[in-house]
Amino acid sequence: MIQMQTTLDVADNTGARAVMCIKVLGGSKRRYAGIGDIIKVSVKDAAPRGRVKKGEIYNAVVVRTAKGVRRKDGSLIRFGGNAAVLLNAKLEPIGTRIFGPVTRELRTEKFMKIVSLAPEVL
């Protein structure tokens, strides 16, 4: 569960290391975001020669949460931390590589590019 002020790791090669959620998109009173939801983030820590700079604002999709996701069969998939992939204005991934596993819940038309780049889909 991601809410405002939550810090997330970045699971791509854009150069950002840590981002902070500044808004959960999708409704005026929406408080929490889960896996597959789009959030607005601010870059808090970035590599010196990366594509993104500290302080820049981007859209991001949540790919891993410590809270996890419940499947229809009752199983629960949790992760050790929260992670996101940065997106451009057209909601396409900025990076060309994805690090770490992603869940099957991302297999929608919007995020097939992320699923195809990921090394493992759970």
UniProtKB/Swiss-Prot annotation:
Swiss-Prot/TrEMBL GO biological process terms: translation
Similarity section: Belongs to the universal ribosomal protein uL14 family.
An MF annotation (GO) of this entry: large ribosomal subunit rRNA binding
UniProt keyword annotation of Ribonucleoprotein present: yes
GO terms for cellular component: cytosolic large ribosomal subunit
HAMAP family: Ribosomal_uL14
Signal sequence bounds: none
UniProt xrefs under Gene3D superfamilies: Ribosomal protein L14
Complex formation: Part of the 50S ribosomal subunit. Forms a cluster with proteins L3 and L19. In the 70S ribosome, L14 and L19 interact and together make contacts with the 16S rRNA in bridges B5 and B8.
InterPro entries: Ribosomal_uL14 (IPR000218), Ribosomal_uL14_bac-type (IPR005745), Ribosomal_uL14_CS (IPR019972), Ribosomal_uL14_sf (IPR036853)
Protein name: Large ribosomal subunit protein uL14
Pfam families: Ribosomal_L14
Physiological role: Binds to 23S rRNA. Forms part of two intersubunit bridges in the 70S ribosome.
Keywords: Ribonucleoprotein, Ribosomal protein, RNA-binding, rRNA-binding
